[in-house]
Amino acid sequence: MPKKEIKSIKSHVSCPRNFKKRNLQDMKHKNIGATESKILSAFIKKSRNWFTVSDAYSLFPELSENAISIQLARMTYDGLLMHICKGTYYMIPYEQDSETFMPDWHLLAEPLVGGEHYIGYYSALQIHQLITQPSLNEQIVINKRIKPSEKAIKGVKFQFIYHNPKHFFGYKKTWIDSFNKVLCSDLEKTIIDCLYKPDYAGGIVEVAKAICMSKDKIKYEQLLNYAVKFDSQAVVKRLGYLLELLSIPTSIIDELQKLRSNSIIVLDTELPKQGKILSRWNIQQNVDIETIKNAILT
């Protein structure tokens, strides 16, 4: 299909929230196949920017899934669609070059997983505007294991991090721009997750910075409830330690003290197990206090 013939349709997919505001009738006057027109129109009307072969097949029960797959492959070749993963396609905005187009990768979490998930760890810190260095690594928390656990799409690594049912909670639809929402851990759960696995959050220094930056937004009772529900000594001890180190006045510190056990955990999982033991929190301080404080001040 010539590029000029698909211009009208591709203009509809530049922004999912604007799909319904566009006039779909002009597609009838373009030299576009009936199947292509029906597929794109259906998902534009639903404000969908991605779909599966099965979704498309439901529009044409008289055709085989193989025939639909061939049609979608042709549309991909024509620059209408981007192939995300097996059986899943993303609609490409007209103004974008199909060879280089890459949507905001937060939007690819749902089509890649196709089930329950949320964006977490360092990626969630980015959505909550708590980091200054964006990463080409999207971290997606899942409650069912996916193999392989990583997938690369046009230079962006998507990492699927498994959480057991006990740890899979505390997420909601969150705005990432003026038009789109994604499932992301809320602020308090983001902090809990990052304390559990600091290596997925850029290290304990990044976690400390995030807590300091959001200290006036954090719901501390919610944070405590999450820590209790998560039921991890590493979370309890790192959280209590950092709240005291950052001089954040909150009564949950006393509650965290009551929850701590006698076992020793390291402050930062990315660094060697060395440094003095802080008996108040039973933490091995393998990161210098000044390193944390200086990072917060810069």
Regions found by a protein language model. Name each.
Residues 1-26:
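Long, low-complexity, charged/polar intrinsically disordered regions in eukaryotic proteins
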Residues 2, 172-298:
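Hydrophobic alpha-helical interaction segments
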Residues 24-115, 216-236:
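Short beta-edge/loop segments at beta->alpha junctions of small alpha/beta modules
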Residues 51, 67-70, 119, 186-190, ...:
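Short, well-structured alpha-helical interface segments that form or flank functional binding sites
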Residues 62-64, 131, 249:
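Short coil/loop linkers at secondary-structure junctions
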Residues 83-95, 101-167, 283:
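Short gly/ser-rich loop at a beta-strand->alpha-helix junction or flexible surface loop bordering the NTP-binding
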